[in-house]
Amino acid sequence: MMPISKKRIGIVCPYGWDTPGGVQSHVGDLAQYLISAGHSVSVLAPALSDENLPDYVVSAGRPIAIPYNGAVARVLFGPIAFARVRQWISQGNFDVLHLHEPAIPSISLLACWAAEGPMVGTFHAAAKRQKVSFAVVPFLEPVIEKLTARIAVSEAARETLREHLETDAIVVPNGIYADRYRDGVLEPRWSGNTLGFIGRFQEPRKGLSILLDALPRVVSAFPDVQVFVAGPGNSDETLEVIEPNLRDRIHFLGRISEKEKANFLTSVGLYIAPNTGGESFGIILAEALASGASVVASDIPAFDSLLGHGKYGTTFTSENSQDLAIKIIDLLSHPEERLNKAKQGKEYAQSFDWDVVAEKIFDVYEMAMAGGRKVTLASENRSWNKFLGRDTNE
């Protein structure tokens, strides 16, 4: 059980709170879990609007969009953000700071520079050196060294950290509320020979095009197959590039609620994750497993690891639509084998439940707080001020 000694915990989310994403979900779920356990939690995050923010979230200002790791990240950086970060730290009286993705230009990096004392950094990114954009290296290393402890959400994220910054981390996976998905209801409209996909489907690295390229071969074996796509995006633009004879079997659902997602994952014949890269964990895979879904995913390192190298789900060669089609056909042809693997995956998914994951994170917090220090403001550094474009009187 998590210790009942109440702590004041500051968590920094680097990405815009209003934009759906794995890091935002992780931070929000962790904050709510810690609050329910009796701790005082404040989350600092960029936000497009102060309206409808949870009570525990403090806006650091409006984010801007930058390309990052094959996607668009909405982050906040610069002298005004630095001042807001310092103010939040000075008012927080925190026992520990938990900074997510402190190695990219964001408020997490600013908080790492601005604070002294117990600080834990969680690293989510997984990418090859040439594909990832970390902050300016001369400023990074001394900042990252200030972290008392480091967490990576997967072995893939840990390897990225070791490769880029030559430092190590404890692996603690992302968490899910497994019971929410375990109790999903089977809905006939999504069941049968159906393929499910959830994500920002117009983002190339999410891989929807690979699933659609596999579809003709799948249809030739299973003429009744239907594809259901949930998530934000322009469905009309996507339908335009799909063969006309296939369009009537592809259904775009738009955004769905958490309850609908649990039912969707419970119901679909196969859940397909054809992502091409840039994934360090795969929360949606853990949620799908917890729902009892039969998962087919690309063999990128994070997905392959999460699926136990094929024990809890099926992998196909990344970006190979023909291999994906073969795997789908084989699974639809052998329902008993498919369901047996899904049953194992559902049991395994309990290891990602917040009851387990939050306990591990709090163990890291305790290690960071072992010296008894509180979080305080560091003195402003003139070279950092110069980097931010502030007046240094030089």
Model-predicted segments: where are they?
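Nucleotide-activated donor-binding/catalytic signature segment of Leloir-type glycosyltransferases, i.e.
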Residues: L239-A262
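Glycosyltransferase donor-sugar binding loop
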Residues: A47-S49, I198, Q226-L239, G254
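Conserved acidic donor-binding segment of nucleotide-sugar-dependent glycosyltransferases
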Residues: H309-S321, D330-E336
